[in-house]
Amino acid sequence: MSLPKGLKNYVIITKTPLRITFGGGGSDMASYYLRYPSTCISATINKYVYVLVRKRFDDKIYLKYSDNEVVDIQHIDDIQHDFIRETLKFMNVSYGIEIINWADIPTRGTGLGSSSSFLVGLLLALHTLEGRYVSKEALAAQACYIEIDKCKKPIGIQDQYAAAFGGFNQMEFGSNIRKGDYKEISGFGFCDQEIRNISEHLHLFYTGVTRESKDILSAQKENLISDQEIVSNMHKNVEIANKLAECLTHKDISSIPITLRQNWELKKKFAGDISNPELDRIYDVATTIGGAEAGKILGAGGGGFFLFWANDKKKLKEALADYQELPFLIDKYGTRVVLNLEQLSW
């Protein structure tokens, strides 16, 4: 079987980081940033989503993720995994292919941006398989298009840009006459030692609760359109993120716990299910008994991972002994190809 023009007879594996957020989350939804300037602060971490793709000898699509699927290439619309289905259609894939996905941690409902990381990694793998260079900005934009426009997910756009670019960044999104719709990504220029210092203060704990972000984000999306009080709170959220960005530009990390605390209090007002009594209890235990200066739930809310800022890791771990800690470091890089191996000819 001859390969389509440009298609490599290779095995490709991509590695794409998950992310944590510090401020501005929610302002990256189109219902906000197309009307008002948005700022988000996030960092990628050394926990990854992996995607393997390879050309098959036949005309079938083999998928292995938390489920398995086998579909004829002529029946691509029968694929149940919406991200894979829409990505293959977007890329005009017309050949048999195998796609395998795995991750360092369970990713569903954790609040670490795993769905966007998977999508960015899948796009990079397919572009590489077809011998095509694609920029980080293009990867992020394509992932946003597939996830939001094609798969109709009620989400923002910071996760896709974080996964593509990697590092500790300020992301600004907006729309105006001078720039049109714009996305600007800028790092803070931290050296390795400064990154390690920040990482040593940050601690992730799993609440044991997974949730579908769709309902929470749908409510938040509607609130940003119809509820002026929510819009006003989002303005405050962006203002807090901008202040943090200014401090981080001057290497002042003391503002991080202040931002986490302020962000968590505002975040709980954006939709009804973002927090609950159990999450409030975890936060209280961490900040009173565990000595954490501040913290926030990551992602849409309702469960997943708490991010805490604390000086005494041992004290915090003892206070939250009933919850699983996820040790991590900040990752400086975005999605990348980690294996590009030529297969034997058929």
Regions found by a protein language model. Name each.
Residues 96-97, 134-138:
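Short, surface-exposed acidic
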Residues 123, 306-307:
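Short hydrophobic alpha-helical segments that form membrane-spanning helices or hydrophobic packing faces
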Residues 99-111:
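N-terminal pre-triad scaffold of radical SAM enzymes
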